[in-house]
Amino acid sequence: NLIQFGNMIQCANKGSRPTRHYMDYGCYCGWGGSGTPVDELDRCCKVHDDCYGEAEKKGCYPKLTLYSWDCTGNVPICSPKAECKDFVCACDAEAAKCFAKATYNDANWNIDTKTRCK
C-alpha cells in the first residue's frame, strides 16, 4: 500500500529527502501522470504507475494491498505471501531501488504539469 511504499523509499534512500518530496515531482510522481517523464526519477515513477496498472488488471488493489517486507542493508526485500501481495510489493520495491539510483532535481518538484507534461 502507499504507506508501505513510502517506508520502502525511506529504506532504500537512508538519510535522503522525506517521502513527501516524491509526491509532487515531475509528471508521474504523485497522483495521476501524463506526458513524457522529465528525468530518470520521474521515469521511475512512470514505471511504478505502469506496474500498478498491471496489478489492477490482475484484479489487485495496489494502493490498498498490505504485504510483508523487510529492509536489509538499505534494500527492500519482499516476503512471499500471495499473488497480489507479491506483485504489488515487487512494484514498490523496484521503484524504491530506482529512486535510490536516480538524482533528485529540485527544479522538477511542484512543476506546472499542464505545460511541462504533454
Swiss-Prot record:
Expressed by the venom gland. Disulfide bonds join C11-C71, C27-C117, C29-C45, C44-C98, C51-C91, C60-C84, C78-C89. Binds 1 Ca(2+) ion. It is found in: Secreted. Its main location: secreted. One of its GO terms (cellular component) is extracellular region. Keywords: Calcium, Disulfide bond, Hydrolase, Lipid degradation, Lipid metabolism, Metal-binding, Secreted. Signal peptide: none annotated. Its cofactor is Ca(2+). It catalyses: a 1,2-diacyl-sn-glycero-3-phosphocholine + H2O = a 1-acyl-sn-glycero-3-phosphocholine + a fatty acid + H(+). GO terms for molecular function: calcium ion binding; calcium-dependent phospholipase A2 activity; phospholipid binding. The active site is at H48, D92. Ca(2+) binds at Y28, G30, G32, D49. Its EC number is 3.1.1.4. This is Acidic phospholipase A2 PA-3. It comes from Pseudechis australis (Mulga snake).
